[in-house]
Every structure is written in C-alpha cells, then in structure tokens.
Curated annotation (Swiss-Prot):
Protein name: Putative phosphoenolpyruvate synthase regulatory protein
Function: Bifunctional serine/threonine kinase and phosphorylase involved in the regulation of the phosphoenolpyruvate synthase (PEPS) by catalyzing its phosphorylation/dephosphorylation.
Residue intervals passing through the bilayer: none
Keyword match Transferase: yes
Pfam families, per database record: Kinase-PPPase
List of residues binding ADP: 157-164
GO MF annotations in UniProt: ADP binding; ATP binding; phosphotransferase activity, phosphate group as acceptor; protein serine/threonine kinase activity
The reaction(s) this protein catalyses: [pyruvate, water dikinase] + ADP = [pyruvate, water dikinase]-phosphate + AMP + H(+); [pyruvate, water dikinase]-phosphate + phosphate + H(+) = [pyruvate, water dikinase] + diphosphate
Key words of the record: Kinase, Nucleotide-binding, Serine/threonine-protein kinase, Transferase
InterPro entries the UniProt entry points to: Kinase-pyrophosphorylase (IPR005177), PSRP (IPR026530)
Length: 278
C-alpha cells in the first residue's frame, strides 16, 4: 500500500563514519518526492550503542505510526541482527553490491569495520578535510564573511534552497572550503551584491529552487508564517534570480536534485577537480 506522506524519519547507522550510508541514502531518496527527517549514528560498535539507536527508531514508529527508513552498514552479526529486528525498513547499503562482486570474481569477502583511512597513513588528506569542515561550519548561513580568501566556493541563495547540505557535502567529500550566504526577506527590499563578494566573483555560485518546492519546505518548518507563504517565496526567488542574471553569477535550480548532483554540477561549472575523500 502506498503511503502519501511528505516526510519520513530516516536513520543512517554505521560502525564507521556513516558517510557511505548518508551518501548512498541521499542518492536513493533523491529519486522520491520526500522530505527526510535525518539522524546519523556513526561508530555503532556495541550492543549498548545499537540499543540506543533502536530506542530512537521505536520512538519514531510510535509517534508517526509508520516505519522509519534505516540505511546501515554494520559488520558484527549480533549488532546487525539486533538492528534488523527494530520496527523499521532496513537497507544494508553494501550487501547487494558486495554479493554481486563476490559472485563475479569468485572470492570471499573479508568484512571489516568501515573506518576511514588512518590518520598516520594519509594525514595530509585527513587534516585537509577536517580543516575544510571546520571552515565550512564557521561560514555557514552567513555567520561571518571573514577569511573569504580561503574559500573555494561561495554559495548564494534564499533560505532553504539547499546551501547548507551542499556546503557540508562538499567539505566532507571533497575537502572544499565553502561559504554559504542566505538572502533574507530584508535583502529583497534593496537587493545588491555585497562589497565583500566583489573581488571573489570567480568563486560565486547561486542556488535557486521552484517557489512551490520552497513553500513546501518552509511550511514544514514554520507552517502558516509569512516566511513560508507562496507570495513571499516567489518574491524572494524572483529578486535573487534577477541579481544572479544582472551580476552574471552562474546558478542552478535545486528543486529535483540531490546534494550529490548539485555538487557535481557546481564543480563542473567551476572547472574544479574532484578530490573524493574516503
């Protein structure tokens, strides 16, 4: 039976960093008209930790009356079996792929904890990514415009157009230092490009979204508010897109794109080399 629900709780559970679970989960969920309420549980390596995750799943099921979606990667059989008994739809993100490779190459897999590369083995890469994540978090949502010289990409757009998840994905997966700046309702009255951005035009990239989709997302956050109204969404988007065109800032519509697709298009347009971190 099809359940017409615009939102669903989604859990990413792993005995490692959970980055693989999140990445594959985002790709899959991007195929559906769904607003995921996401929670991530990395380093679930003991029965106590998985018990805590199961409690969260049970709370979600009891509250919403529908089973949440769980994307997981767990090696220890006992922990895996505990998780599979939870009231959720569970998806092992590696199982079908590993089985197919095993059949094709006729070799038994040797499961191991899904750790990232060790710091000692690849310390420069590790610390580059940590620095990129810290920089991106410090420059999220217009918190500060200091240190723009260090930025690789500067994302511009209205609130809830996908800037934060895209910024963090770029930092975590590609080690890019990303600034994201939101245009708010007050900016619409006198829309202009901030002086701080003038000398960094080559780093600017705009994100826009369909007004209907923006209204849906904002209603889920602040239902009935002027901020979420269709009229306000359309006004903000029209004004910001006019700025992008006037200032020759490249931009894309994120309405039907996953963060992975958004990132790929930005990197291609910016001519930047992909440096995927494991």
């Amino acid at each position: 039976m099809q359940i017409n629900s615009q939102s669903r709780d989604v859990f990413y559970v792993s005995d490692g960093t959970a980055i693989t679970c999140e990445t594959l989960g985002h790709v899959v969920l991007g195929q559906f008209s769904l607003i995921p309420n996401e929670k991530t549980f990395p380093f679930v390596e003991s029965e106590d930790k998985v018990a805590d995750v199961i409690k969260e799943i049970e709370i979600s099921y009891q509250r919403d009356g529908v089973k949440p979606l769980v994307f997981f990667s767990i090696v220890v059989p006992e922990i895996r079996e505990m998780l599979l008994k939870a009231p959720a739809h569970g998806y092992d993100v590696l199982e079908s792929i590993v089985q197919k490779v095993q059949d094709d190459i006729q070799m038994e897999p040797q499961p191991k904890m899904q750790r990232s590369r060790s710091v000692s083995k690849d310390s420069d890469t590790y610390f580059d990514r940590i620095a990129a994540i810290e920089y991106t978090l410090a420059h999220d949502d217009g918190i500060t415009l200091k240190g723009l010289d260090e930025a690789n990409i500067i994302l511009l757009g209205v609130s809830r157009s996908g800037k934060t998840p895209t910024s963090l994905y770029m930092a975590m997966q590609f080690g890019l230092r990303v600034v994201n700046y939101p245009f708010i309702a007050e900016d619409v009255k006198m829309m202009r490009l901030l002086p701080e951005f003038e000398i960094h035009r080559h780093k600017l990239f705009g994100l826009t979204i369909n007004p209907e989709r923006l209204n849906e997302i904002r209603e889920n956050r602040l239902s009935g508010s002027e901020y979420a109204s269709t009229e306000q969404c359309k006004l903000e988007l029209d004004t910001v897109e006019a700025l992008f065109r006037r200032e020759a800032i490249p931009y894309i519509n994120t309405s039907s794109l996953s963060v992975e697709e958004i990132t790929t298009r930005i990197l291609e347009r910016a001519g930047m080399k992909r440096r995927l971190f494991g």
